[in-house]
């Protein structure tokens, strides 16, 4: 088995074929490019041959004279010639159209013979294409066509487009998950969509313009860390709010007791102390106290303390 590469095409466009008993077997594939090259070579050879065999001006002039004025032995001369004999100068230059006419006729005849030969061999070429079964092909190399950085950028854009399409097709599910997380109707789940929506919801509550598409650049580990941080922050904040409400209730009771004892200057102290001031001044201490006392995130206790805080501000207990 002999493999012969045909490399008359471009660098990456390489075709190979293998046949038994090559080169004795002449029935191999000829591509359209090879056929055009053969035709061009044949025309060039014809032009060179015609330029080499063109007769001299004297020979063309004598041939033209023989055609125009035949000999005396010619029957046409005996019957038709009525003009007197004239002297013809041999060194007269021949007409240019005569030489071009001869060259064009020879070229047309050779091209006709070549076309006939090609048409006769066309069936054999088509049969050889169906008979050859061991012809491997090779596609152009992608490394030459595309740049590495450009291919990476195209892949990244394709991934972003696919994620956007997936988010568009699942918009209703995303809205349901967002509603459940926002109103707390279901506990947090460790799914990718819930984590991402929880992060976006927290960012929007704090006035940060963040969308789900902005989180596409984050890896799964980063999403998990952000989600855990937000969850821990909410839990610690709930514990801190419980301690803060207890402090506000105690301050209101002390204010009423001092007013009862006649300290009018203490009036309005409870209105000056708010949750924000407590959070700024002793927020970390409240968090530490809640952790030491083991106060958990109890929604019931938080609601009770909130209601009690409102009533203590309005009602005089002492």
Swiss-Prot record:
Induction context: Expressed in the late phase of the viral replicative cycle.
One GO term describing the cellular component: host cell cytoplasm
InterPro entries reported in the protein's UniProt record: Poxvirus_A11
Location of this chain's protein in the cell: Host cytoplasm
Coiled-coil blocks: 145-172
Post-translational modification note: Phosphorylated by a OPG054-independent mechanism.
Swiss-Prot/TrEMBL keywords: Coiled coil, Host cytoplasm, Late protein, Phosphoprotein
Family: Belongs to the orthopoxvirus OPG137 family.
The protein's assembly and partners: Homomultimer. Interacts with OPG160.
Function, as annotated: Required for viral crescent formation early during virus morphogenesis.
Record protein name field: Protein OPG137
Species per Swiss-Prot/TrEMBL record: Vaccinia virus (strain Western Reserve) (VACV)
